[in-house]
């Protein structure tokens, strides 16, 4: 694996010798990498290679999976998130996640975004500002400002996904994980989400799982290629796509297998 982050101060997430098992099946094998701050890191690889399992390790979503066992370290700003004193609720607030299919709550647009701040104790008088700022950051406010009390499910698929991003932003995370966020969307909605992700990296560290090679090339600064639970190669996206060091990386990128 190629080390690309020379300056430790640039590193936001450090993963050291991460192994994960579902029962007897090992899904991740000795994964180590450093994810730079305020960047977009794309994870690519064939279905079942471990990339979605990996990002769920970054906010301990795999804790919810029966018979899941993890070894190794995940450090966020030098704190081991698998330490015994870690508040997992606070961790998931700081490391937000947007899933493959939009999953708005069955409530109004406004209440979807206000939900997280409310349960985390944000003062009622501040909620309006939080909601509006989150919707603006997700490039959705102009489209919804006159119907914030309308059902979230009345939005289009692309708008629903941006609403889910706004909901994530409303609790002020430091890191945002995206698990194939555009795979269920049309090309126009996909382009808007991609533009949004590239804009958000100014304020957040972003890790995205994608099966879309062109998408990874368009929006990411760094790319990791997973195969059979192993991180085969990690580097700057330009290097991975134009001069990969590993033959399996080249074969995957050029479509020889998938």
Swiss-Prot record:
Q: Can you tell me which family this protein belongs to?
A: Belongs to the ABC transporter superfamily. Phosphate importer (TC 3.A.1.7) family.
Any one GO biological process: phosphate ion transmembrane transport
Catalytic reaction equation(s)? phosphate(out) + ATP + H2O = ADP + 2 phosphate(in) + H(+)
User: Which pairs of positions does the record mark as disulfide bonds?
Assistant: none
An example of a Gene Ontology cellular component annotation for this protein is: plasma membrane
Where this protein primarily resides, as one coarse class? membrane
Tell me which residues make up the ABC transporter domain: 13-253
Provide the membrane topology annotation: Peripheral membrane protein
CDD domains recorded: ABC_PstB_phosphate_transporter
Q: Which Enzyme Commission number(s) are listed? A: 7.3.2.1
Gene Ontology molecular function: any one? ATPase-coupled phosphate ion transmembrane transporter activity
Q: What is this protein called?
A: Phosphate import ATP-binding protein PstB
According to its UniProt entry, this protein's organism is Methanosarcina mazei (strain ATCC BAA-159 / DSM 3647 / Goe1 / Go1 / JCM 11833 / OCM 88)
Give UniProt keywords alphabetically: ATP-binding, Cell membrane, Membrane, Nucleotide-binding, Phosphate transport, Translocase, Transport
* Chain sites annotated for binding ATP: 45-52
- Localisation: Cell membrane
Q: Which Gene3D superfamilies match?
A: P-loop containing nucleotide triphosphate hydrolases
Provide the function of this protein.
Part of the ABC transporter complex PstSACB involved in phosphate import. Responsible for energy coupling to the transport system.
Could you describe the subunit structure of this protein? The complex is composed of two ATP-binding proteins (PstB), two transmembrane proteins (PstC and PstA) and a solute-binding protein (PstS).
Q: What is the lineage of its organism?
A: Archaea, Methanobacteriati, Methanobacteriota, Stenosarchaea group, Methanomicrobia
């Amino acid at each position: 694996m190629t080390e690309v982050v020379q300056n430790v101060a640039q590193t936001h997430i450090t993963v050291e010798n991460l192994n994960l098992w579902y029962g007897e099946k090992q899904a991740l094998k000795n994964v180590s990498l450093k994810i730079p701050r305020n960047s977009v890191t794309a994870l690519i690889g064939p279905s079942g290679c471990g990339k979605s399992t990996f990002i769920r390790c970054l906010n301990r979503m795999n804790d919810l999976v029966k018979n899941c066992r993890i070894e190794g370290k995940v450090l966020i700003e030098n704190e081991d998130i698998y330490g015994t004193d870690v508040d997992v609720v606070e961790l998931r607030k700081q490391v937000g996640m947007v899933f493959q299919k939009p999953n708005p709550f069955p409530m109004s647009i406004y209440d979807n975004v206000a939900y997280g701040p409310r349960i985390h104790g944000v003062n009622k008088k501040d909620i309006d500002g939080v909601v509006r700022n989150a919707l603006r950051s997700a490039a959705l406010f102009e489209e919804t400002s006159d119907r914030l009390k309308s059902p979230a499910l009345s939005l289009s698929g692309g708008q629903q996904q941006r609403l889910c991003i706004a909901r994530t932003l409303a609790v002020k995370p430091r890191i945002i994980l995206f698990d194939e966020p555009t795979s269920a969307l049309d090309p126009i909605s996909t382009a808007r989400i991609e533009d949004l992700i590239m804009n958000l990296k100014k304020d957040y560290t972003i890790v995205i799982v994608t099966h879309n090679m062109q998408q990874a090339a368009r929006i990411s600064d760094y790319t990791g290629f997973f195969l059979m639970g192993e991180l085969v190669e990690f580097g700057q996206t330009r290097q991975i796509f134009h001069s990969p060091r590993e033959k399996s990386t080249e074969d995957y990128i050029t479509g020889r297998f998938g």
